[in-house]
Amino acid sequence: MITVDDCNGCNIFIGPTKGSVFLRDCAECRFLIVCQQFRARDCKVVDIFLCCATQPIIESCNDIRFGCFCYNYGALEDQFKNACLSIFNNNWSNIHDFTPAEGERNWSLLPKDARIEDFFPLPSPEKLGDLQIMTDPQSSLVSQTHGCLQRLSMQYCLVVFFADGHAQNRALSLIKELEQTDNILLRTKEILLEEEASERIFGTNAYNKVVKRGPVIGLEYNGKDCISMCLETAKNIATSTGCTGLVYVSTCPKTARKQIENFFSHADVHKIETKS
């Protein structure tokens, strides 16, 4: 566990951590954090750009703002792997408040256009050395998700990539292509699925064999015509890679919401499995 106590007016970066990060009695601070578990207690006026594999928890906190960890540098990918963390398992916006105040909210999400460099000014080139730091969302190792509170329309789409040794690259390719559209990526998750869960999510046993190959990567999209856009993009990627049977895309708006609920509910109640 990494514990940060009694900090005031600090900027703190905590790189990929296999265990938990615990903030206590911090005020007017800004954090960049990647961890398995996150908790804050007795903190106030704190901004946190977070990548957390499990649900973040706050207790007796006030005016805490959360944003998606959108950052990159040369060694970050290896650090994720060494910490056994998946770049697709980020619950940054799904906050549990142990001590909610009636009529008030102790936490909020940072504005969608919040830029990390405005909170964490980059050091001088002399101090940076060859770190190759990038702070724009398009260059981030962790994809920018908009969180469970953001919505553009009533249409949703679930995209699931099955393990074949290239699932991560194909998922990132789809995310990159859809960044050029008006659709938004709400959530991502990398988990193992059993046959029973697979049938409940997809409504068929047709995927029972492929889910046994390893973790699947699920993406939740929202936006007008997001289903048709996801289908077209996934088809183009499948055609170019020759892996036409290793991706699932919702085809019906009426069933997509239920599929998304089943997929992410299953992920929330089961232990996250990551590749070491």
PLM feature segments, named:
Residues 1-81:
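Extended, compositionally simple hydrophobic/Ser/Thr-rich segments
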Residues 49-276:
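Intrinsically disordered, low-complexity terminal regions
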